[in-house]
Amino acid sequence: MSSGKITQVVGPVVDVAFAAEDKLPEINNALVVYKNDDSKQKVVLEVALELGDGVVRTIAMESTDGLTRGMEVLDTGRPISVPVGKETLGRVFNVLGDTIDLEESFPADFEREPIHKKAPAFDELSTSSEILETGIKVIDLLAPYLKGGKVGLFGGAGVGKTVLIQELIHNIAQEHGGISVFTGVGERTREGNDLYWEMKESGVIEKTAMVFGQMNEPPGARMRVALTGLTIAEYFRDVEGQDVLLFIDNIFRFTQAGSEVSALLGRMPSAVGYQPTLATEMGQLQERITSTKKGSVTSIQAIYVPADDYTDPAPATAFAHLDSTTNLERKLTQLGIYPAVDPLASSSRALAPQIVGEEHYAVAMEVKRVLQRYQELQDIIAILGMDELSDEEKTLVGRARRIQFFLSQNFNVAEQFTGMPGSYVPVAETVKGFKEILDGKHDHLPEDAFRNVGSIEDVVAKAAKMKF
């Protein structure tokens, strides 16, 4: 095991010099520095660049406080490796695979896998087209998720990305009994803590492994924690043959962390100050998230959109890798419609008659047509009022508003805030409900009856209790 000495510390970036006779560590190898000769207090560094003359530039996975020039650095001879297997379920890890849930840690000889791997070979990939039922009406009807696909949840700050992810974890675990890996990348520690205790209370934690590299951690940890979560998910797929759900909240923070260290590594910034290697880094992560003949990894990624600008390089780079997009719209939160999913901006390549069936496809297309026409008529309504519309247009507006409200529903994970029990709506019920609204069967019911309910039967029951 070769050793070197720290020559420079600039924030999270550390330069290490090795003697001429020592073998230089390979790129992505993990190096270890022990603070104050205390074997418990160590900092792990990852090799990013070889500068020549026996010097390597590394990124710290933990705070570099207390590191000084001249400290000894040991090469572990391999990349960061993390625990894998069924024992990881119900546990919480950091980027290095250390447990952070105050329970017993894993022994040193426990099975581990390196976080840096190649994507599966082309001939190992599977191309199935099976729908993953989420129980959330707006998603299942208009932008369905594919098993083994990649889904992006796009939205600005505070529009409900994390709540939607929590509901998806809840529904998949309760209704499908599926294994999930939740990766918190650069998000709020409070949210991670809340999620952990909520999942523990509901029993969902037994089917979930959690990995966190939160906002307060150095950029190195936020850059690599997504790979830690992915490595755990890949093991379930490749060795256990499972269908796994990988949640990443938030993929933008992965890009942001890379941007923070990019200039310190000596790279010239590109558009909007992002790292020039943005597309490569995103590709290396996304290409590993795929389905093989052994099992599948379905990933659901929250993607923060800076200043609601979809042309920003970070969300734009992520777009290229996705099968489905779920766009969250601030205007809908102002109308009190939750989840605030934009039915016209959200899309999915699974919304095709050969995948979802003729009836589902026809209903979804008609819902989109009605909502699109309603959007076009809103300018006329705002200027001239409803009286200037034809009878046909007035009927269409009434149905569009009912559809818009019916796309909302109460979430199980939001019950503590709303005081209303959540609802899981099967796809068949969703299609039936919207078909009845389009056919005019419920034109006589008040619009408010359609707000925050599950199936169409719930609408009828709610309307019966209302005075109108």
Swiss-Prot record:
Record function comment: Produces ATP from ADP in the presence of a proton gradient across the membrane. The catalytic sites are hosted primarily by the beta subunits.
InterPro entries for the chain: AAA+_ATPase, ATP-synt_VA_C, ATP_synth_F1_bsu, ATPase_a/bsu_AS, ATPase_alpha/beta_chains, ATPase_F1/V1/A1_a/bsu_N, ATPase_F1/V1/A1_a/bsu_N_sf, ATPase_F1/V1/A1_a/bsu_nucl-bd
NCBIfam families: atpD
Protein name, as recorded: ATP synthase subunit beta
Reactions listed under catalytic activity: ATP + H2O + 4 H(+)(in) = ADP + phosphate + 5 H(+)(out)
The family this protein is said to belong to: Belongs to the ATPase alpha/beta chains family.
PROSITE patterns (alphabetical): ATPASE_ALPHA_BETA
Keyword terms, alphabetized: ATP synthesis, ATP-binding, Cell membrane, CF(1), Hydrogen ion transport, Ion transport, Membrane, Nucleotide-binding, Translocase, Transport
Gene3D superfamilies recorded: 2.40.10.170, Bovine Mitochondrial F1-atpase, Atp Synthase Beta Chain, Chain D, domain 3 (1.10.1140.10), P-loop containing nucleotide triphosphate hydrolases (3.40.50.300)
Gene field: atpD
EC number: 7.1.2.2
GO molecular function: ATP binding; ATP hydrolysis activity; proton-transporting ATP synthase activity, rotational mechanism
Any Pfam family: ATP-synt_ab_N
Sequence positions that bind ATP: G155, G156, A157, G158, V159, G160, K161, T162
Main location: membrane
EC category name: translocase
Compartments reported by the entry: Cell membrane
The keyword Ion transport appears for this protein: yes
Protein species of origin: Streptococcus suis (strain 05ZYH33)
Subunit structure of this chain's protein: F-type ATPases have 2 components, CF(1) - the catalytic core - and CF(0) - the membrane proton channel. CF(1) has five subunits: alpha(3), beta(3), gamma(1), delta(1), epsilon(1). CF(0) has three main subunits: a(1), b(2) and c(9-12). The alpha and beta chains form an alternating ring which encloses part of the gamma chain. CF(1) is attached to CF(0) by a central stalk formed by the gamma and epsilon chains, while a peripheral stalk is formed by the delta and b chains.
Any one GO cellular component localisation term in the record: proton-transporting ATP synthase complex
